[in-house]
Amino acid sequence: MKDLFNAIAATSGQNTYRRPDSSSVIYPEKHAIDIDTLLAKQSIEYPAGTYMMNMITNHDLNSWEGTEFERLGNLTRAMAVLTYTLPGMPLIYTGQETGLNRALEFFEKDMPPTWTPRNDYFEFYQKLNHLKHTHPALRAGSSGADMKRYPTASDDIYVFSRKDDGGATIYVFANLGKSDAEVKYTGEAPAKDITAVNFFTGRTDEFPTTLSPGEYHIYVSR
């Protein structure tokens, strides 16, 4: 997942990381729609019920390929949302929950991040952790709900839902591209008569019809 996210962000013009020799990392062109290909590949290569590890950063990435902000830019939060809502288990690396924007020393002891005062990154990840722990559709492995995709005309728009056996459903919307895009469905679309609460605002909203670059939403419906 992390390698695909890096490539999607680079395609969107978000990757600003430069190696110590000032050269940039070359990534293949990828878009949000390529997440489908990765998930299909994982379903073939790994046994059913496997806990896939989803992440936007880790110790190797942070030290040798740049922080998530250098690699993912304004897509950082949208991609973090996907690590929590796609099938699998999210990984948080040291300092990610505080928005730490520097490389940690790899072979030497480094200073830990400062957790106080709490900032909006702490609140952001606290909310996602709560959702992951409490929403039955987001359980990892075979206990979690299957994912239902809603294809759109834009390769950069990613929309899906996960519904548990009791009917509790989450809907996720994200624009991983470089431009504003219309959420125009090319197949089945989420039902329009659904009463859904925007997870981050707590308001009952209609699903978005356009998304700006890096924009993301989670809706919860019962």
Show which residues each predicted segment covers.
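Active-site clefts of carbohydrate-active enzymes
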Residues: P47-R71
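C-terminal beta-strand-rich structural cap/linker in extracellular carbohydrate-active enzymes
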Residues: D205-R222
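Solvent-exposed beta-hairpin/edge-strand motifs
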Residues: G187-G202
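Beta-sheet entry/capping signal
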Residues: Y51-M53, M89-I92, A168-Y171
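Conserved short secondary-structure transition element at the edge of the structured enzyme core
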Residues: V81-T98
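Active-site-proximal helices and loops of the catalytic beta/alpha 8
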Residues: M1-M52, L82, G99-L131, P136, ...
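Asparagine-centered strand-capping/turn motif at beta-strand->loop junctions
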Residues: F173-G177
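Short hydrophobic/aromatic beta-strand or adjacent loop that forms the aromatic wall/cage
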Residues: D155-I157, A168, P213-I218
